[in-house]
């Protein structure tokens, strides 16, 4: 992202369109870094655990590496980390969000290693394979976009709603032969 922003600055780009449509997400810390590159100040995202106890808040630290106008494209398949970026851009008034309401995945999961006993062998990895590992993924928190807004189950609502046209592929050979 930083390399692209440096190039945009050298080329005197007048605006940026960030396309997060069909982006299922990614790593929490990477979403925070992308948002930080565009936003001057404020809480970019925060995490809360059970009972609403705040676990972590990520603040803008880079003073917004770029100041050019920003539009973020989203759709119903934009989820998780992409919603962190879109929510920060929208709720901190850094740019406009265009498209459909996003997926609404505001939950944070952690993967815990499990060592299960092997039947008849005491303790150790399952099936006696020392390389085999098991894990348990648990939801441990949810993240909130700026303004302490939960997107879990509701998504990020765009500033400008645009319903995509569903274009069907036409068989031009058949169409021509029918004429």
Go through each PLM region and give its residues.
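Cleft-lining beta-strand/loop regions that shape enzyme active-site pockets
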Residues: 1-121, 142
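Acidic surface patches and DE-rich sequence motifs
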Residues: 49-51, 128-131, 145
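Short, surface-exposed patches at the edges or C-terminal ends of soluble domains, predominantly
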Residues: 62-64, 111-114, 126-129, 147, ...
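Intrinsically disordered, low-complexity segments enriched in small/polar residues
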Residues: 109-131, 162-179
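Conserved catalytic cores of soluble enzyme domains
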Residues: 125, 138-139
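Conserved functional hotspot residues or short segments at active or partner-binding sites
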Residues: 135, 142-179
């Amino acid at each position: 992202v930083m390399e692209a922003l440096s190039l945009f600055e050298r080329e005197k780009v007048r605006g940026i369109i960030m396309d997060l449509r069909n982006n299922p997400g990614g790593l929490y810390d990477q979403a925070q870094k992308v948002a930080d590159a565009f936003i001057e100040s404020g809480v970019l995202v925060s995490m809360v655990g059970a009972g609403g106890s705040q676990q972590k808040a990520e603040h803008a630290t880079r003073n917004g590496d770029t100041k050019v106008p920003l539009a973020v494209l989203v759709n119903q398949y934009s989820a998780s980390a992409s919603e962190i970026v879109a929510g920060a851009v929208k709720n901190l008034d850094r740019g406009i969000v265009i498209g459909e309401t996003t997926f609404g995945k505001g939950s944070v999961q952690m993967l815990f290693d499990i060592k299960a006993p092997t039947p008849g062998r005491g303790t150790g990895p399952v099936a006696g394979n020392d390389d085999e590992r098991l894990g348990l993924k648990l939801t441990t928190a949810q993240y909130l976009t700026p303004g302490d807004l939960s997107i879990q189950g509701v998504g990020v609502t765009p500033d400008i709603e645009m319903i995509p046209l569903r274009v069907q592929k036409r068989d031009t050979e058949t169409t021509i032969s029918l004429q």
